Amino acid sequence: HLHCLEAMQIANDFRLSLIPIVEKEAVYLGAVTVNDLLQAIGKIVGVRDAGAVIVLEMEQRNFSFSELSRIVESNDAQVAQLNTYWEPQSERLIVTIKINKFEVSDIINAFQRYEYPVKYYFGEELYENELRSNYEHLMNYLNI
């Protein structure tokens, strides 16, 4: 039995659109399509789960699941999903966090307060935070 991530790696390595399923005795049982694998991986990463996504970029030595989780949980949310990958161009770790609520203003502010660079996010921000940000941009512009 292969995990869907292993099957996806095989499909990618050999550029397959269909992966045959065989028993040890080479008896053909059926096939799995790449689309089937994408749907399975989508379930694993919670594509359809409600909530916001926050993407951080950091040095690998600064990554601490417990610290990131503590920051999220201290803002009345929970980590529903956390994935990481190494970005060779920037030589930094990209951390994608899915949380169980859409409003992210307090969590974004907390990450910034603890000096975790927020690369981007998909969620809702309170109107007052947008207003404050626009005001700060205007003041910076007027000071130029």
Each language-model region and where it sits:
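Short hydrophobic beta-strand motif reused across regulatory alpha/beta modules
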Residues: 17, 29-37
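A conserved regulatory-domain signal marking ACT and ACT-like small-molecule sensing domains
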Residues: 41, 50-144
